[in-house]
Amino acid sequence: MTYNLWGDAHLEQREPAIRDLFSIRPPDLLATQELRPRSRAVVDEALPGHARVHDDFPGWGTQSNLWWRQELFDLVEYGTRDVGILDTDARLFWVRLRPRAGDARPLVFSTAHLTWPGHAQERADRRNLRTGQAEQVVTALDEIAGDEACLFTVDINDIGQPLWVLGNGGFLDSFSALGRTSPVTHPVAPLPFVTDRGTRLSPLGSPSKAIDWIFSRGPIATRASEVVEFFSAGNAPSDHKPVAATFTLPSTTA
């Protein structure tokens, strides 16, 4: 599962829904964007059988982290890579995991949150920042994962060129892999604690779009994919919808 947790926005109202989501349907693997220390603590509480990266680099608590079910995976190594994302401590975050069951192949699990189109630099020069960031992600994962099975999860903040870059880099999203198109992942509506119609840059509301993705590459097969509709006591956990997918890792002898 990949999930943008919407930073600190209305977090107090959303905490019960975040907790309920992960308690009701805990994923084996979870990638997050717009993470904060408080929401990280909520996820930790809701996923007691999972481990995540513990590291002094601030981005693991203020941008993204990666969780895995401990009975299924062992951590081999982890790291970050600067891929040009214009936000403090934003990186490509990744882990290499070894499945415990049978002789399944190792897996690189990674995430990033590409720069928002409303960033001051992009508004000033009118140049798409995410295309180059996607190119750097592909280059980084070429080096990190090589020919290994690789999952890349992302809030891509775009509907065009960055997606094409990933596809031409050998990645296939979990819906295309099944001959489908993704449902909308942002924005979630209704949100009872949000009354504004527009955004801080425009009176227009944010259009419905799919910007949250799970991509795969290498020896790993997509079996199912879903954009999750979830509310708890009338509240959504975020202004994004989580995306969940099921994969099969072949054995090392296959």
Each predicted region: which residue ranges?
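N-terminal, active-site-proximal structural segment of metallo-dependent hydrolase catalytic domains
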Residues: 1-46, 62, 107, 249-254
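Active-site flanking residues adjacent to catalytic metal/cofactor-binding acidic residues
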Residues: 3, 33, 112, 153-155
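Structured beta-strand-rich core segments of catalytic domains in phosphoester-bond hydrolases
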Residues: 29-116, 226-227
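Metal-dependent phosphoester-hydrolase catalytic domains
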Residues: 142-150, 158-254
